[in-house]
């Protein structure tokens, strides 16, 4: 029998060494013990996989950009090599996402009781995130399917968070941040993205006095990110309008 505390300790150690694949493997084993995760364990799992998938997302973006430039050059051999490499990274990224999604469906979301609102929203947000990462690299019907799954998870989490959590709660704010990014980047719906982000920001500002001391830093940081995105997106929309002569 694997010792749970040893696995968690290993994950902490791997995080300090920035060995995120090891960290993810340890937290995957903890999750598969099929017992609820503590807040710390939940965060360890999230940080581990965020770094594992983040490295692949970053590599994929770099190679995709090189692929576009190479296509313009017309060097067939090089084009084929770059495409094959992009597909290799894509497969790795998809495998990581499927790993997380199966942990969420088979253990984490499934085992949330009615009273574990915070955990349920956290895991549904995570589900939306990992389907969003799949949507970044998918095309055609496959993309449509993962986009729909992402929207469904975000939407469910959003409804629960609005009903049961303070507008200043960092998990509710983090969900609004990522859900609005989904609308902007994946759905190409800037108006919906801005509306969601602005509502979350305004609601939190209106209830600043409910800010929990423990989560003050997290909440205010996410509020800042929401505001930064709003500034960027509204200026982008104005630029687009300007280009179309709609000033």
UniProtKB/Swiss-Prot annotation:
Phosphorylated by various PKC isozymes. The record marks 57, 132 as: Interaction with phosphoserine on interacting protein. It is found in: Cytoplasm, Cytosol; Mitochondrion matrix. GO terms for cellular component: cytoplasm; cytosol; mitochondrial matrix. Keywords: Acetylation, Cytoplasm, Mitochondrion, Phosphoprotein. Residues 2-247 are annotated as: Interaction with SPATA18/MIEAP. The modification Phosphothreonine is found at residues 145, 234. The modification Phosphotyrosine is found at residue 133. Coiled coil: none annotated. GO terms for molecular function: insulin-like growth factor receptor binding; phosphorylation-dependent protein binding; protein domain specific binding; protein kinase C binding; protein sequestering activity. One of its GO terms (biological process) is protein localization. SUPFAM superfamilies: 14-3-3 protein (SSF48445). The modification Phosphoserine is found at residues 71, 215, 235. The modification N-acetylvaline is found at residue 2. InterPro entries: 14-3-3, 14-3-3_CS, 14-3-3_dom_sf, 14-3-3_domain. The modification N-acetylmethionine is found at residue 1. CDD domains: 14-3-3_gamma. Homodimer. Part of a complex that contains DSG3, PKP1, YAP1 and YWHAG; the complex is required for localization of DSG3 and YAP1 to the cell membrane in keratinocytes. Interacts with SAMSN1. Interacts with RAF1, SSH1 and CRTC2/TORC2. Interacts with ABL1 (phosphorylated form); the interaction retains it in the cytoplasm. Interacts with GAB2. Interacts with MDM4 (phosphorylated); negatively regulates MDM4 activity toward TP53. Interacts with PKA-phosphorylated AANAT and SIRT2. Interacts with the 'Thr-369' phosphorylated form of DAPK2. Interacts with PI4KB, TBC1D22A and TBC1D22B. Adapter protein implicated in the regulation of a large spectrum of both general and specialized signaling pathways. Binds to a large number of partners, usually by recognition of a phosphoserine or phosphothreonine motif. Binding generally results in the modulation of the activity of the binding partner. Promotes inactivation of WDR24 component of the GATOR2 complex by binding to phosphorylated WDR24. Participates in the positive regulation of NMDA glutamate receptor activity by promoting the L-glutamate secretion through interaction with BEST1. Belongs to the 14-3-3 family. This is 14-3-3 protein gamma. The gene is YWHAG.
């Amino acid at each position: 029998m694997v010792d749970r505390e040893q696995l968690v300790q290993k994950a902490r150690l791997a995080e300090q060494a920035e060995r995120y694949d090891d960290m993810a493997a340890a937290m995957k084993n903890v999750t598969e013990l099929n017992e609820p995760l503590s807040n710390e364990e939940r965060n360890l799992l999230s940080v581990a996989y965020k770094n594992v998938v983040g490295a692949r997302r970053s590599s994929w973006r770099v190679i995709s950009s090189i692929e576009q430039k190479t296509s313009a050059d017309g060097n067939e051999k090089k084009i084929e090599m770059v495409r094959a490499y992009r597909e290799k990274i894509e497969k790795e990224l998809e495998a990581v996402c499927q790993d997380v999604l199966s942990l969420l469906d088979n253990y984490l979301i499934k085992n949330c009781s009615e009273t574990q609102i915070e955990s349920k929203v956290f895991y549904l947000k995570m589900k939306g995130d990992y389907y969003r990462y799949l949507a970044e690299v998918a095309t055609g019907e496959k993309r449509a399917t993962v986009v729909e799954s992402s929207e469904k998870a975000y939407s469910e989490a959003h409804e629960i968070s609005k009903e049961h959590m303070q507008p200043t709660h960092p998990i509710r704010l983090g969900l609004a941040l990522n859900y609005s990014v989904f609308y902007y980047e994946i759905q190409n719906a800037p108006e919906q993205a801005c509306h969601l982000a602005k509502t979350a920001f305004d609601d939190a500002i209106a209830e600043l006095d409910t800010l929990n001391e423990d989560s003050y830093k997290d909440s205010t940081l996410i509020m800042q990110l929401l505001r930064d995105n709003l500034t960027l997106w509204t200026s982008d929309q104005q630029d687009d309008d300007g280009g179309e002569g709609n000033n």
